[in-house]
């Protein structure tokens, strides 16, 4: 695009100043050179672009180098933000060489790896999936109508912070939680209407105001995490929601079982799997992201699916807890994935049902390359 403008000005190249003062000087010079033939407009929130319609060139400036990188909107058990530098050392060579066309996450969760991946690599196709319908609806709402979502979040946050004491805030939290649970299962999760937008806003609100940022469902499918006792609540970042909306713009968003991604997989695909972790003990049982438990049978089914994807030729990286943290003789994953590469990395617990016991633990990373 800049080459097109340079040709118009009979120049080998052209530079654009970020400073508004010097940009105005550059604008004047360009207009003088072309004797009024170019119409230049400045808009510091849009990407640099050139529109040659009607023989007029419109230049729109964006602070592209400093724009906010999308980050997770929700706090989610097993978040991987701190492990990304380690993961980057484990990525397949084909990804680094630009030979991966499709990127897929069948267990999107909070999406830390996903957002990092989109900020550093280009793909022809990106697919995310999760079995949690509330989570996926929230991503769809952010993608389609971020401003409407922010408006509701702002009202919820302001009302919460205006309440006089924790007793009133607690009542308001449970009021929103009850509304959230009442709507679950009654919504059409394929339609983004006012009810869906409100539901997504409530999802974010209770995620930020509940105890320890934990998402947990009971056997009936109801969100059952208690009040987090926060004096002041900051439940959203406007800039980040807009950045996430932009990141999701061309992403295929699925809501279902992990095996549903297979139609998008070929030999030029990289898949990162971050399934609900196998609990290390009773107090770390945080795989209740939906009313259907992700037990050892589900882990075995996932390992068979891993084999199937491997046969297609996809590159796969999978995370999980390391049973050897509590039982050195537990070979569960070592046996399931004995034909693949298994490495152990150090990680910090960020969510615990009791808010205690946080510290360094070993996690496993399985790759087929």
Where are these regions (language model features)?
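Conserved proline-anchored active-site loop of SAM-dependent methyltransferases
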Residues: 1-16, 26, 87, 103-117, ...
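Conserved Class I SAM-dependent methyltransferase catalytic core
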Residues: 8, 299-348
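Class I S-adenosyl-L-methionine-dependent methyltransferase module
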Residues: 15, 23-60, 120-249
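S-adenosyl-L-methionine
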Residues: 40, 50, 55-102, 107-108, ...
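Mobile active-site "lid"/loop adjacent to the S-adenosyl-L-methionine
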Residues: 222-231, 277-299
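A structural motif corresponding to the C-terminal end of an alpha-helix
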Residues: 237-252, 303-316
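Short loop/edge segments at beta-strand edges and connector loops
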Residues: 254-256, 346
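Class I S-adenosyl-L-methionine
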Residues: 335-369
């Amino acid at each position: 695009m800049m080459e097109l403008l340079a040709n118009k000005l009979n120049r080998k190249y052209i530079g654009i100043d970020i400073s508004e003062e010097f940009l105005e000087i550059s604008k004047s010079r360009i207009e003088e050179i072309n004797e009024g033939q170019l119409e230049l407009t400045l808009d510091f929130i849009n990407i640099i672009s050139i529109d040659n319609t009607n023989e007029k060139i419109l230049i729109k400036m964006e602070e592209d180098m400093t724009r906010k990188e999308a980050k997770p909107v929700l706090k989610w058990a097993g978040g991987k933000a701190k492990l990304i530098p380690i993961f980057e050392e484990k990525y397949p060579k084909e990804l680094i060489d630009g030979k991966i066309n499709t990127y897929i996450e069948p267990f999107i969760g909070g999406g830390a790896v996903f957002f990092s991946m989109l900020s550093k690599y280009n793909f022809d196709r990106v697919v995310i999936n999760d079995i949690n319908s509330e989570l996926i609806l929230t991503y769809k709402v952010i993608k389609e109508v971020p401003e409407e979502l922010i408006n509701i979040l702002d009202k919820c946050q302001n009302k919460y912070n205006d309440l006089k004491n924790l007793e009133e805030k607690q009542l308001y939290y449970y009021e929103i939680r009850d509304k959230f649970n009442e709507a679950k299962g009654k919504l059409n999760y394929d339609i983004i209407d006012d009810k869906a937008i409100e539901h997504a806003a409530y999802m974010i609100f209770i995620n930020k105001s509940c105890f320890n940022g934990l998402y947990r469902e009971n056997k009936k499918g109801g969100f059952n995490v208690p009040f987090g006792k926060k004096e002041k609540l900051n439940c959203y970042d406007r800039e980040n929601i807009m950045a996430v909306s932009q990141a999701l713009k061309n992403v295929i968003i699925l809501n279902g079982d992990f095996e549903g991604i297979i139609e998008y997989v070929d030999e030029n695909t990289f898949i990162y799997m971050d399934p609900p972790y196998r609990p290390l003990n009773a107090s770390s049982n945080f795989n209740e992201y939906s009313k259907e438990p992700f037990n050892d049978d589900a882990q075995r089914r996932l390992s068979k699916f891993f084999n199937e994807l491997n046969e297609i030729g996809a590159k796969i990286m999978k995370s999980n807890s390391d049973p050897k943290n509590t039982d050195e003789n537990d070979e569960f994953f070592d046996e399931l994935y004995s034909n693949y590469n298994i490495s152990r990395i150090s990680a910090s617990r960020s969510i615990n049902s009791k808010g205690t016991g946080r510290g360094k633990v070993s996690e496993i990373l399985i790759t087929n390359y």
